[in-house]
Amino acid sequence: MTLQKYRLRTKSLHILNHHQNGTTLIEIIIVIGIVAILVALATPFIQSWRQNFEANNLFQKISPALKQARSSAALRNVAVSICGGTSTSCTGLWRDGMLTFIDINHNGTIDSATDHIIAHTPLELSYGVLIWRGAGGRAHIIYQENGLPLGSNGSLRYCGQEQKYHRSVVLSMMGHTRRSPDRNLDGIYEDTNGRPFIC
């Protein structure tokens, strides 16, 4: 084979290989269409999974905050309150987080002269709201100097977008916490009376 024929043959093979490596516009459109269909099918599942995760994970955030407040009250021999609020003040909005603070006069607000903040537990809720329903009609939880709730037994209710995402953290008269059960395993959690709770 002569050198000129070899160069010509190599050049034609190079051109042939170059065209085989590319993708056509039709192939790109098909791939984009398939990806769009998969995303459309997966989005409801992902959102449902995230809502369920938020509802189930809430107990792991709330229970330690309540236990810390209870032990702080007993160890320091002072009243400790928990309210819904930011890291610096009680707003009454539990979605902002749980603010734990020493509450000398049991009024549920931070008095700068006597009270100080112990901790703030951010909740970062995206799919539901958190509501405190307690005895005595208070908007906050108070642990007395002995570590027992002061008329504050009740529940922190998480109200999701659908009833299957509703959850509750129950605070007993002794200051213990437990999560709401699903006794009949129907996917709907019940209140302390065994009825599905409604937000």
What are the residue ranges of the model-derived segments?
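N-terminal helix-rich module
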Residues: T2-H14, L41-K67, S71, L75, ...
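Alpha-helical hydrophobic helix detector
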Residues: I29-F45
